[in-house]
Design a protein with these regions (language model features):
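Short catalytic micro-motifs in class I SAM-dependent methyltransferases
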Residues: 111-115
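Conserved class I S-adenosyl-L-methionine
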Residues: 50-58
Length: 121
């Protein structure tokens, strides 16, 4: 198995698997609950969150969750899909070789690993 390429995640892919309710593979409520748990736990631990990195951010489901819990935090999305980078303004990149220029307080990489080959894990 090879890791997914940017060509895999074109507009048709997202229309079919994210934006069409009949064929969607993502449950926004599940992501909402997961994100609320993660953010609430960080708040409970009193972890200061000012800068958030979401690698493999997709359509940005975590962005609004983070903003509700940490309104002062900046959110930076990195995404392999050229289509989503154009649509949402993400930085194009891959979890396999992404190198952040600055440190982040919270790094999210949810739902990405199934798209990677064993050699890229």
């Amino acid at each position: 198995m090879q890791s997914a390429t940017p060509e895999t995640f074109d507009e048709a892919y997202y229309q079919r698997f994210y934006f069409d309710k009949k064929t969607s593979v993502v449950d926004p409520m599940h992501v909402e609950r997961l994100g609320a748990f993660v953010c609430s736990y960080l708040q409970y631990l009193r972890v200061p969150v000012q800068r958030v990195l979401d690698v493999g951010c997709g359509i940005g489901l975590w962005r609004d969750i983070v903003a509700r819990h940490f309104p002062q935090a900046s959110f930076h999305g990195v995404e392999l899909s050229e289509y989503l980078c154009r649509r949402y303004g993400w930085e194009q990149g891959s979890v396999v070789n992404y190198e952040a220029r600055q440190p982040f307080d919270l790094v999210i990489c949810q739902g990405v690993l199934p798209y990677l080959s064993p050699g890229d894990l």
